[in-house]
């Protein structure tokens, strides 16, 4: 149950989120790694709960994922980037072989040892923010919590994340499986001001979004109405942008 939950959490932040299985020749018990089957086999409903949450997160991230995957297909730059690749001038970063960048904005630090509840994470130069809790981290090594059912993911300062969120406006909320519309297109912006060109896959066009240091958003070539939410360091005002 622990390995399954760790695997599906990390898979949400990889190019392909998919579970595989093989048969033993005996259909009872089934070897299928569907979350409902795993929950039944292991007698642990958390398998289903963890999968549901991270499957929803995956769909929430789709505007960001599509944009970053499109960048990879056009440039050859990998979607998952080792710390050594992403930060070539940082010798310490290269020592953290299990951490990686997922696209240009997200740092992922999966737990890889059985029973881990905390994890030492190395943050390169700058300020980083917890994707799920907004906590700020300065450069260096920090010990972070990683209980089962969670995954440490951090956002680089100055980033802008295009997201498709559900009614709650939070990561992990269901938006279904449709890719022909957005339920709530939302840009999460992080302190430092930045610019991000994202691909609007619903309307088939690229748009540049800029967030100034004061939190004001400027959009060029935008079709869909969207919310902006300013994240990090208590910077949580929100407003509408069209």
Please annotate each region the language model reported:
Residues 150-242:
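Accessory, solvent-exposed terminal regions and/or long lumenal/extracellular loops of proteins
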